[in-house]
Structures are given as C-alpha cells and as structure tokens.
Amino acid sequence: MSGNTFGTLFTVTSFGESHGPAIGCVVDGCPPGLALCEADIQAELDRRKPGTSRHVTQRREPDTVEILSGVFEGKTTGTPIGLLIRNQDQRSKDYGNIADTFRPGHADYAYTQKYGFRDYRGGGRSSARETAVRVAAGAIARKWLHERFGVAIRGWMSALGPIEIPFVSADAIDGNAFFAPNSAIVPELEAYMDKLRKSLDSVGAKITVTATGVPPGWGEPVYDRLDAEIAYAMMGINAVKGVEIGAGFDSVAQKGSEHGDEMTPQGFATNHAGGVLGGISTGQEIVVNMAIKPTSSIAQSRRSINRQGEAIEVATEGRHDPCVGIRATPIAEAMLALVLMDHALRHRAQCGDVLCATPRIPGKIA
C-alpha cells in the first residue's frame, strides 16, 4: 500500500493495523544532537491515548513508546528514528459480524473496492489507531521547533456538535477530557455526551490549532505552499472533512478592505490570512480550523450491503469513540508540528544564508 510516508526532508513512514501486534513509524531527517528520550514522546501520547474518560472508547491501551534506533546517549544521531507502540487490548471478536458487511460511513467498502480484500478487525489500517504514531513523531518535531525557534503549538476543541466553545484560557485545555479552553462549559459538554451515548449515536466536532513563533519565510511556492501542506496534513487525519486557514470560509463574505491584513511598523493589524501569504509564513500566528465528522461506528441499525451486494441491516458492536473529535486535538497539533518541521529544514536548505534588508514586524500590534 503506497501513501504511507509524509514529508520531504523530515519524513514519517508509519506501519501497523488496529488489531495487529504493534503500530510504529520510522522518522527520518531529524537533525543530530536533539536531546530525546521516551518520556519526551510519552507525554504527548498520554494526551491522546484511549480509555481516559467515559466519553471516549474504552479500549485500554497504555500506548507505551519504544525508541528502537536513532538515539544514542540521550541524543538524536541524525539517522532514522524507529518508534514502536505495541497493541495490548485488541478485541477482534467484536468485529466478526462485519467481516462480510460494510459499515455506512466507514472505509470498509472503499478499501474492498480498491484492494479486493480488507482487514476488518477494528478497521485495520484505516483505523485512527494509526494516529498514535503520528503523535509520537510529532513530539520529536515539536521539541526541535520549540528549542530551535521557540515555536509553540496549541490546539483545542472549539465546538462539540451544536455547542460552540468560547476560548477563555489556554490553562483550561489540558484540565478536561474535551481539551476545551473553557472549564465552565465542561458540565454542559458532559451532559450532552451522556445523552448522546444513551441514544446510540455519535457527533462531530471542530478543532482549532495554532502555532506561534514561526519565523517569516517558511513555505515553498507554488505547489508546496505552507497553507496547502497544512491543509493536506489535516485532511489526512481520520474523519476530518474540512480545513480552514485563518478566516477560511468567512472570507467569502468579507470585502478586500476588511480581509487584507494591514501592516504598520508596529505590526499587523489583523490576521485574516492565518499567518500565511503567498504560501509563505508571515511571522504571524498560524491559525487552522478543522471539521471532524461524527463517528461512523454506531450501535443503531442502518441500511447497507454485504460482500455479495445484498441489502442488509448493520449495527456496529465494539468499543468506539462517540465523538472522535474529543481525542483529535493532540493529533492535529502533531500534524502541524510535522509540517512546520519539514518546512523549517527545507527553508534552511535553500534560503538559510538569505539576509533580508526589510525589518520583520510583529505578528500583531501590541
């Protein structure tokens, strides 16, 4: 199966299936000398792992990462970094009833049409289980970006189904199961999810992720524009159906006099562009929003077909997230880190010696 490698200079090649013995990845292109240990990666994996609240899948996976190569005496060597996460709580018997059927909204039908065969256990390769290794790889990129440039990446849930979540404080994000930047709204989110779970249904979400401290100049026009690669990365996350950069679709209703971010010696007046102009970073905050569809695995009976093309009714058993968006924040952060890391190295390779006479202005007016 092709399409398993992400990146140009900083690459991640992942492998494994939801119910296989392990998942993992090979990270290539990491500069030597970065202090790195398993604890650096584990901290990010623990934010994403399943079974952490009643509102997510109850599959219990410790998601313990093993560094197999590329690190010696606590520092990266510049050679490929092998990462492995062993699966420990597979329950494949839950999927026996869908071996010959297709779940509505899932990749089952598409995989069968493409390959003529599929691993039906937990979705196999199409499962969001694979995103654990993206988070692991993203932790490496995130650490290098922060230490080298001071880049800070932060994501949060900005809507759960019909409930908009106003941003109040970044300090609240890691203090609740939803990654909500507003502690006061958590009881409402919990009540909504409890009611939803009883109805045997699922719901979508909106995730916002930002990056501050990104220098101006990153991005490779015209086909590898920074915003295009960010959108590509986010659309590669399971269940993501839409991505916005900056004002996004709100740009449709804006006038040019409003949308164009005015510049002053003191900084940019606004950030409708989301930190990218002409496919190149401006030094402003990079702002990304993504729409995540409702979980396709629900216990309600729905119409479908079997492998013979016959009409059937199918209800999905097993342990599933009633809202996959609840655990998507660390994944979105990781993918943004991977894109920025790749473009930092690409910029250094081609334009590392460029000295611009025009002074940099702040990302926003103080």
UniProtKB/Swiss-Prot annotation:
Chain sites annotated for binding FMN: 125-127, 238-239, 278, 293-297, 319
This enzyme's EC code(s): 4.2.3.5
UniProt pathway annotation: Metabolic intermediate biosynthesis; chorismate biosynthesis; chorismate from D-erythrose 4-phosphate and phosphoenolpyruvate: step 7/7
Molecular function GO labels: chorismate synthase activity; FMN binding
Family: Belongs to the chorismate synthase family.
NCBIfam families according to UniProt: aroC (TIGR00033), PRK05382.1 (NF003793)
Sequence positions that bind NADP(+): 48, 54
Name the UniProt record assigns to this protein: Chorismate synthase
Keyword Cell inner membrane annotated: no
Top EC group: lyase
Annotated organism of origin: Dechloromonas aromatica (strain RCB)
Function field: This reaction introduces a second double bond into the aromatic ring system.
Any single GO CC term annotated in Swiss-Prot or TrEMBL for this entry: cytosol
Keyword tRNA processing (UniProt): no
The protein's required cofactors: FMNH2
Source organism superkingdom: Bacteria
UniProt catalytic activity: 5-O-(1-carboxyvinyl)-3-phosphoshikimate = chorismate + phosphate
PROSITE patterns, per database record: CHORISMATE_SYNTHASE_1 (PS00787), CHORISMATE_SYNTHASE_2 (PS00788), CHORISMATE_SYNTHASE_3 (PS00789)
Subunit structure: Homotetramer.
GO biological process: amino acid biosynthetic process; aromatic amino acid family biosynthetic process; chorismate biosynthetic process
